[in-house]
Amino acid sequence: RDAQESRGLGDVYKRQMCMARQSDGVFYLRLEDTDKKREIEHGADEIITSLAQYGVCFDEGAAADGEAEKGSYGPYRQSMRKEIYQTFAKDLVKRGLAYPCFCSAEELDEIRKAQEAEKADMGYYGSYAKCRNLSIEEIEANIKAGKEYVLRLRSDGNAENKITCRDLIRGNIEMPENIMDVVLLKSDGIPTYHFAHVVDDFLMGTTHVIRGDEWISSYPLHEQLFRASDLKMPKYAHIAPIMKLDGGENKKRKLSKRKDPEASVSFYSKAGFPVQSVLEYLMTIANSNYEEWRMKNPDADMSQFKFKLEKMPVSGALFDMDKLASVSRDVISKMSEETLFDEISVWAKDNDEKLNAYITASPDKFRESIKLWKYNGKKVRKDIAKWSDLSEMFPYLYGDGVDGYEFDEKLTADERKAFLTAYISAYDHKVDSSAWFDGVKAV
């Protein structure tokens, strides 16, 4: 399953790893929109459209605004599943595994200050959980008095005990049990992410959850919630983030949507990297054996590669723009002239006004011009890594022309004209560079 997140390169990277289609399963989108402060307007539209261009399509789940959801396990927006979560929460209360907490913000702040003074772990747990052992009479009195409350898990964890997360990428990870009496339902009856995640993954039949490694620390809580609710837990794979080198000391850091323009998928669209190039590159950093497979299967569709989670990097793949460009040159070199025409035409409409005008006015000339940079004689060239390279590398074809060239002062205007006329007459774009140079010398 896939939860609502941002539309960055890392998300395309993560969703490329989805094993649903290789296992005849279902890949679905669930919008986790219970936190209205963080909700993104038209979030479903952005997720679906931005990822669709990279071939990431959902089999079922939440749909774009105004469209009907697909699938039998909806609604797929958590804000529409409030009563479902409350039913599961009620069962936990009946079994003594959850309780109402009436602590005010001021009381919670006092607990925090006491923990700071005592240098204790922060949180609502153990002796610091003031409402944990309230009697039924006290609870009823508080509710009748109109006191607001949240519903908390009654944790049975012990910090001295260890649990094992059997991660599909990292292997077994030992961690202390959860001891926190976390909030399950907020005062408005809306669930927290952690509780909704457990209920929905069970009801929607989730078998595998693939998520970022920042969620590893939440595993003990999720394990406890699944166990308390007597629900089968899915398998987890925690993916390390894409990294980049930062500064002169070559320090690695996480690729950031705030700092790095290349972290956004729109960066690649605007630059003109073909979708297939980006996906091909991401696979080279996602699975250590992909490049070897590609060498043996140069013309095979990427979907034929058997992706393995255990082959993913544990420490985080290093993003390399030069490597992306190299991969993209290979991808573009294999495109037919017709495919090149179609892809460049679509890209130019939104990203290169002059090139678009040229293609629109002279489509046949543009088709012919493709041959000039695609071939060197009979050999296929690998000069172009992205569509924006065209105007930069071939301004005499698609840009403003070549400015500022100065002939030798010894040449008269007539001699210059005679040279250009002879060169044009002798030029043959079908010959290779060696034959071309011999022709220039002859002129």
Regions found by a protein language model. Give the residues of each.
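Glycine/small-residue-rich interface belts in oligomeric ring/scaffold proteins
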Residues: 37-54, 227, 255, 274
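A glycine-rich helix N-cap at a beta->alpha junction
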Residues: 44-76
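Catalytic adenosine-cofactor/nucleotide-binding cores of aminoacyl-tRNA synthetases and other
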Residues: 229-413, 417, 424
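Conserved short loop/turn motifs at secondary-structure junctions
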Residues: 31-38, 73-81, 210-212
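A generic secondary-structure signal for well-formed alpha-helical elements
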Residues: 51-58, 93-100, 112, 119, ...
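Active-site cores that bind ATP or allylic diphosphates and position pyrophosphate for catalysis
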Residues: 91, 99-100, 104-238, 243-255, ...
